[in-house]
């Protein structure tokens, strides 16, 4: 960190614009969000288990596709497909009904909700599904809701391997509990990486569960 600051990089807080120097003496840890290619290289060398530092969530899904299909750093549309796939499944059961408000009354067996599976193709198209017989549901409504989860500008979702345009993506139901995802578009990544920093600033613990209208009370009672 001191080396980058010494070279003149401002390293400002992406929410407040506050310079890093203002908290430098209180920093406890710092982790850059790395991309998928080092993970794919580990797979290429025969690793059965890959232990990584902090990487982008979607890199965990993108790396196996890079390794399996030989995608290159300049294959931005393909990398964007992997980023979309990783983003869709990165929060587990959110995309199988755990975070879906569409037709929520008909979601079955949520206490045994299934976790998502991506069936990736060499051209970057993929199907989102789940294990047969597990609870929840995979449909285009749930995938759409997960697509816009924590992304900022949907036309420019920044990652270490590419910038993804989520507005280019097309969804189609592909049978029960199957959604096909196509046409992801990508562009070259920026010269920057996201840096997560923990620093000492006292402590606060807050827990919140939010249920949106309509029928917010009924949803909360159903979840109890």
Residue ranges and their predicted role:
Residues 63-69, 121-130, 199-209:
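Short acidic (Asp/Glu) and glycine-rich catalytic loops that position anionic groups and cofactors
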Residues 77-183:
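A conserved active-site cap/scaffold subdomain adjacent to cofactor or substrate pockets
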Residues 54-60:
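Gly/Ser/Thr-rich loops at beta-strand to alpha-helix junctions
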Residues 165-224:
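C-terminal non-catalytic interaction/assembly regions of soluble proteins
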């Amino acid at each position: 960190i001191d080396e980058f600051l010494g070279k003149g990089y401002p390293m400002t807080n992406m929410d407040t614009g506050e310079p890093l120097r203002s908290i430098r003496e209180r920093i406890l840890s710092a982790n850059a969000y790395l991309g998928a290619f080092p993970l794919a290289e580990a797979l290429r060398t025969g690793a059965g288990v890959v232990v990584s530092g902090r990487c982008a969530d979607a890199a965990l899904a993108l790396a196996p596709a890079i390794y399996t299909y030989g995608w290159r750093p300049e294959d931005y549309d393909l990398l964007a497909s992997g980023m979309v796939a990783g983003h869709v499944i990165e929060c587990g059961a959110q995309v199988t009904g755990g975070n879906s408000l569409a037709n929520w009354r008909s979601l079955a067996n949520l206490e045994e909700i299934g976790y998502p599976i991506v069936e990736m193709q060499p051209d970057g198209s993929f199907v989102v599904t789940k294990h047969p017989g597990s609870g929840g549901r995979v449909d285009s409504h749930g995938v759409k809701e997960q697509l816009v989860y924590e992304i900022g500008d949907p036309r420019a979702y920044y990652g270490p391997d590419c910038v993804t345009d989520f507005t280019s993506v097309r969804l189609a139901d592909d049978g029960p509990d199957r959604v096909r995802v196509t046409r992801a578009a990508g562009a070259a990544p920026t010269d920057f990486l996201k840096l997560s920093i923990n620093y000492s600033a006292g402590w606060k613990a807050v827990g919140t569960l939010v249920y949106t209208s309509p029928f917010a009370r009924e949803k909360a009672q159903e979840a109890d």
